[in-house]
């Protein structure tokens, strides 16, 4: 993959900050490494606005995703769907919610904004799931199935994990890299010398960039924190790190860490990668560049530099998702090994872990396919090796779906078709080949749960150096 020639310059500009966030807040200081505030640059604006940073709709969607994920374990389609399509009136924030030592400011989605997830979901066909459904149809199908059984042991599906990991890709990742950082960065789309919309105080480019940052999910002050501090915020553990303005509560609009930014921090705290820092730095420097245009159209040189920041964001964001695929392929492999020897007393517990890991693997692998880049043959290999469902103990797995579909594309009735395609050893080998694929195609570096050392021995036992993928 092509790397931006700005990367070296950007990484060289990163400085390690040793002072505490709480101290900054109490002193009323503002750091140049915080995303905002940014001044009004729009020519002719005469309103009261003084800060043009605005991405509350994106944060509300993160909250709706987290709440849908929480609702998915309860088995109510209507509750899940309300967080997916939006609802009139107040909607309680199910997650993230306050806990002892970590009070959160907002309790209602509408305190942040009133958007929906469905309208921003990738609209293309999903070849990683049976019957050529679109992404919204897949999500609706999973919510329908989750109402029947949130964890369906009969087919090995954990719908909470499938829904969460795929929605993060099909909404947040897709919207950011294939819309706001792509189409809306074009010279004739959302120009910088005009408001994003009538009455707005921010320009077209300013707001488009801010919305992409909102989908990324980092706190505005994430660059002031270590990866571990960012990680702990997402785990609701470190109020001092989260509470940048020192008011004693965590404002979800700017002080929390969501979605792929959280996963980036989880990899970076191992010390091998700097995904969160690199992406945040590129977002911040890109916003400063847009602001420096002072309400004028971006010059060719400015736009070229801006697209260099876009390249850094796209490359590293894709890697974060690929790292997640790598990690959960390793987790799934370890569960497959454990299931071969586990006693009856622990079988249900181990199988529950297996369902969770495979669901995360499947969701992230599908998310990898809805970005700006068509990953082509890599997607085909990935889909065949991951499958439509995890291999069960009788070596069967989902091979299709049969049922009745309404005119709206939603299934009225549906049941899974099961079949035997390959052996348990083949399934294990597939997980290792997925890890190798993530290294070869995306250059993943953190490599959590790396099990590749076992690949040669397993292939030898099967009697082939090739996987038994269903091709």
Language-model-detected regions and their locations in the chain:
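Mature extracytoplasmic or organellar-lumen-exposed domains after removal of signal/transit peptides
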Residues: 28-471
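Gram-negative bacterial Sec-dependent N-terminal signal peptides
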Residues: 1-27
């Amino acid at each position: 993959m092509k790397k931006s020639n700005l990367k070296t310059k950007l990484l060289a500009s990163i400085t390690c900050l040793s002072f505490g966030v709480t101290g900054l807040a109490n002193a009323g200081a503002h750091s140049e490494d915080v995303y905002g505030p940014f001044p009004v640059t729009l020519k002719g604006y005469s309103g009261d606005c003084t800060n043009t940073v605005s991405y509350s709709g994106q944060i509300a969607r993160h909250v709706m995703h987290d709440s849908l994920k929480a609702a998915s374990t309860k088995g109510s389609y209507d509750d899940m769907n309300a967080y997916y399509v939006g609802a009139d009136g107040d909607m309680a924030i199910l997650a993230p919610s306050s806990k002892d030592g970590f009070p959160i400011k907002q309790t209602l989605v509408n305190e942040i904004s009133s958007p929906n997830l469905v309208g921003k979901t990738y609209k293309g066909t999903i070849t990683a799931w049976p019957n050529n459904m679109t992404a919204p149809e897949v999500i609706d199908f999973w919510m329908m199935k989750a109402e029947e059984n949130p964890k369906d042991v009969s087919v090995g599906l954990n719908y909470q994990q499938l829904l969460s990991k795929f929605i993060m890709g099909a909404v947040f990742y897709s919207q950011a890299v294939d819309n706001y950082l792509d189409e809306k960065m074009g010279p004739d789309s959302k120009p910088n010398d005009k408001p994003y919309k009538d009455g707005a105080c921010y320009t077209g480019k300013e707001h488009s960039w801010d919305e992409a940052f909102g989908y990324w999910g980092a706190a505005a002050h994430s660059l002031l924190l270590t990866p571990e501090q960012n990680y702990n915020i997402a785990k609701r553990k470190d109020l001092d790190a989260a509470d940048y303005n020192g008011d004693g509560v965590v404002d979800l609009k700017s002080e929390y860490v969501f979605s792929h930014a959280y996963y980036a921090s989880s990899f970076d705290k191992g010390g091998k990668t700097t995904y969160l820092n690199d992406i945040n730095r590129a977002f911040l420097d890109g916003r400063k560049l847009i602001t420096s245009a002072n309400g004028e159209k971006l010059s060719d040189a400015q736009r070229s530099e801006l697209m260099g920041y876009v390249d850094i964001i796209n490359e590293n964001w894709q890697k974060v998702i690929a790292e997640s695929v790598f990690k959960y392929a390793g987790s799934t492999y370890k569960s497959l090994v454990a299931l071969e020897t586990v006693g009856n007393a622990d079988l249900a517990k181990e199988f529950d872990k297996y369902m969770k890991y495979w669901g995360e693997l499947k969701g992230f692998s599908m998310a990898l396919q809805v970005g700006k880049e068509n990953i082509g043959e890599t997607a085909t290999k990935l889909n065949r090796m991951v499958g439509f469902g995890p291999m069960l103990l009788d070596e069967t797995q989902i091979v299709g779906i049969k049922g009745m579909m309404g005119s709206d594309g939603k299934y009225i009735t549906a049941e899974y078709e099961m079949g035997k395609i390959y052996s348990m050893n083949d399934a294990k080998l597939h997980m290792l080949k997925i890890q190798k694929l993530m290294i070869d195609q995306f250059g993943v570096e953190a490599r959590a749960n790396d099990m590749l050392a076992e690949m040669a021995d397993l292939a030898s036992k099967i009697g082939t150096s090739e996987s038994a993928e269903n091709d």
